[in-house]
Regions:
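Nucleic acid-binding interface residues in structured DNA/RNA-binding domains
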Residues: 3-10, 64-166
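DNA-contacting interfaces and partner/effector-binding or oligomerization modules
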Residues: 1-24
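Compact structured core domains
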Residues: 18-69
Length: 166
């Protein structure tokens, strides 16, 4: 069973989804790919996982870097899972590029190169926004490109994180 809850953030409404294992989704309401992995049958109900995710968001939007992570259980291909694991290693307050992620993943796989577009596709389909920090990935020239929640939210998240790490 999938359980959901709504969370009101300073940047707008967020839908949280979880199963008994961990958080399965975190989407800004109305974002691209909104709740695309959410089962048709789900129940709005408080669970320990959702409570932990809400606590994480309270700390984060309160201007502090959370020192814990709720259990995560995102559905995705093996490739997406690899990319999302890389995203989790980008430190708060820092950014990286799609190309740098592609080079890092290629090196970890023992390959000479990897497509930045393929990595970008996996980043763009991240189902747990903010906690899996896809907003920390920028274009080669540092431009704020592509964020399913919208560029305005990406910029606001990066500004918030810069304040956290000062």
């Amino acid at each position: 069973m999938i359980y959901t809850q709504h969370y009101e953030s300073p940047l707008g409404g967020i839908l949280l989804a979880a199963d008994d294992t961990g958080l399965t989704g975190l989407w800004f309401e109305g974002q691209k790919y909104f709740a695309r992995t959410l089962d048709a049958v789900h129940q709005e109900q408080e669970t320990a996982v959702l409570s932990e995710a809400r606590r994480w968001l309270d700390v984060y939007f309160g201007g502090k870097e959370p020192d814990f992570t709720p259990p995560l259980h995102p559905a995705g291909s093996a490739f997406q899972q690899e990319v999302w694991a890389l995203l989790r290693r980008i430190p708060c307050g820092q950014t990286t590029t799609y190309g740098a992620l592609a080079r890092q993943l290629a090196a970890e796989r023992g390959l000479s190169r990897m497509s930045a577009q393929a990595v970008g596709g996996a980043v763009g389909h991240n189902v747990i926004s903010i906690i899996i920090p896809c907003h920390r990935v920028v274009g080669t020239n540092g431009s704020l490109t592509g964020y399913a929640g919208g560029i305005d939210k990406k910029a606001a998240l990066l500004r918030l994180e810069m304040k956290m790490t000062r």
